[in-house]
């Protein structure tokens, strides 16, 4: 399977230099199964399907979207199972839960260092590449062991600006 994601890449040294490119990740079902086992998670059919869906999605799905996408394929899948499984994956560090505001929670299977931009008009969430050493830009962080950082940006996407 191939995973195609659209990224808006920003070079933070030159704010005017912006490019859009498509990146392709090759992830096999066997690799995903091994990731679950490495995290100490038994790879049941439902867990593997949910993990595969979130890791393949570039749309930052909600639990409801994951459920709707997989319920026919898996038959006995419940929304509660999806919520519990996603929480299990988040707790294991396999995916991230995005809480850009108090009313919206979605999930991200892209574990590379990136920020999230949410358009205030259309609601679309876009991954923005960033340098891995962006933590060094934070003052007063010496002596801390940072295990996670999430950067959320809000504004208008290029499509909404054109309208």
Regions found by a protein language model. Give the residues of each.
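Pre-recognition alpha-helix immediately N-terminal to the DNA-recognition helix
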Residues: 48-53, 65
């Amino acid at each position: 399977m191939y995973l195609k994601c659209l990224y808006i890449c920003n070079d933070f040294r030159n704010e005017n230099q912006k490019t859009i490119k498509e990146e392709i990740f090759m992830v096999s079902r066997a690799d995903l199964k091994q990731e679950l086992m490495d995290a100490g998670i038994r790879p049941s059919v439902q867990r593997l399907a949910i993990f595969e869906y979130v890791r393949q999605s570039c749309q930052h799905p909600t639990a409801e979207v994951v459920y709707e996408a997989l319920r026919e394929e898996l038959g006995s899948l419940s929304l509660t199972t999806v919520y519990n499984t996603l929480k299990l994956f988040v707790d294991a560090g396999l995916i991230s839960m995005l809480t850009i505001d108090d009313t919206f929670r979605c999930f991200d299977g892209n574990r590379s260092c990136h920020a999230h931009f949410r358009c205030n008009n259309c609601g679309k969430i876009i991954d923005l590449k960033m340098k891995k050493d962006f933590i060094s830009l934070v003052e007063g962080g010496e002596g801390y062991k940072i295990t996670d950082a999430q950067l959320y940006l809000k504004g208008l996407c290029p499509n909404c600006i054109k309208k």
